[in-house]
Amino acid sequence: MQSSYPETYAYLLAHYDRLVPKCVSRDGTRDVPNATADTWYQYGRTQALTAFINTPKLIVGVLSKEPMYAMDTNDILIASGGTAGYCAVSKKDGSPYALEYIQAWLSNPITERILEIVGSDFEGGFTARGTFVLSTLPFVELDFAVEEQKAIHDRVVAASREIYEINDALSGRPAKRIANLLQRQKETLISEIQGLIDRVYRLDY
């Protein structure tokens, strides 16, 4: 660490008293069973740290007030466990559903209402939406052999990708007039996606 990432090491060293584990120092406060005197800065959690390497995924904020399902294609490392941190959703092998569609399904207000009912409630209006809760969610399957149903899926995916492009454009801080136009386009697309998922919930193909 010190030779490969000297500035990171210097930052960690500046906070040594807060980071040193109990097993390394009597003054330590962290429980990191595998840490040594040489790896005192070691991260405490190991759950799912390598489960989604080189895998596009949705990063889910486990404990949140609003839906948070961020598309990640940059191999961001996440820590998970219980109702802390984040969990991830990836595409199953052989699944016909794009991650963009799953993201739209999870973000839909109907899905969110179900999560509020079945998820654990925490003080301050927070709802836990971890892997166990997500695995129990109802999911209306589409018949991809039926043109109208496949068209709904494909349009949700296309509209989602348009939103990603708009977000990229907005991150470049365009002129206010352009930003307002892009924001309106984004809101229109979000409304369209929500309407399409609402139709699937109603079996209105």
Enumerate the language-model features and the residues they cover:
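Polybasic, glycine- and aromatic-enriched phosphate-binding surface used to engage nucleic acids
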Residues: 1-151
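Non-catalytic DNA-recognition/assembly elements of restriction-modification systems
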Residues: 139-205
